[in-house]
Amino acid sequence: MKNEGKTVILTTHKLKEVMATADRISVMRKGRMIHTIDRSETNERELARLMVGKEVAPERKASARTRGRPLLKVEALEVHADHGRKALDDLELQVHEGEIVGIAGVAGNGQKELAEVLNGLRSWKKGSIVFNGQEIKTASVRHMIEAGVAHVPENRMKSGLAGGLGAVDNLLFKSYRTDKRSRFGFLRTSGNRDWSKSLVEKFDVKTPDIDTPVQQMSGGNQQKLLFAREIDHDPLLMVAVHPTQGLDVGATEGVHRLLTELRDAGRAVLLLSEDLDEVLQLSDRVLVMYNGRIVGEMSGDEADRETIGMYMAGMYGHEDEKLAEEVAG
């Protein structure tokens, strides 16, 4: 279109996209035009700073504390997908207190099913799951919530929030049964509204009113509200699936900060993401899934895109297992 003499206006928060296509770039923040610059005179880091209003540090932030005991132990787990195919095959992993474990892998290699199992949404055929010293026998969402597992799902509006309801109702989903939120089966309306307002303020959720349907919020504010609910429940383990998908630079930085704060407070974080930059930036340990198994493990300091990519493609780990099986046979 440009070569035909037409003018193209591209609106996006994806920095790689704008750097690959635009001739001039204008940055908007909070409804105002902040800056306009030729693409040849800028870079992604400067654009990120203009979008957020401050410097965005992309380097990995290591934990300042020693990791604690194993909080989650998964051994020889076998899970079938909806259509009957084996989604997890003899999967084993551990997540310790005070660490972020990032799981990388091409979509469709069992990440979805793993997250569902850990949140009580899917049952398993074989294997064991030990959480906080107790073996989990059957899948139950309520049991996993009460045990201390928080969940940020891949699709926040499909599985995490009720779009037609406001902040108050969405924040109550996990805690409405507790004595703080209800009494004799009736919600503590006044107290719950005050509590909701405090969480909206604490997590910097931008909304006209706590009763405004969350579907009218931006994606970043929806995600902050979801994190507010999950973190307020004081979880031991956070299972975060593609937590920054569709978010702009500022909202992404905010989500990353929340995850690292959980880790630094001694909580465990299991991060499932297809964004390798995100996995590399946040993870203390990196695991790679392929064909329903963990085929690679490395520390956050040792991990690099090339090695992870080879594992994701099945070029490492998987062939070694096949060779070992052939020798044993």
Regions found by a protein language model. Give the residues of each.
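Glycine-rich phosphate-binding loops of nucleotide-dependent enzymes
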Residues: 1-329
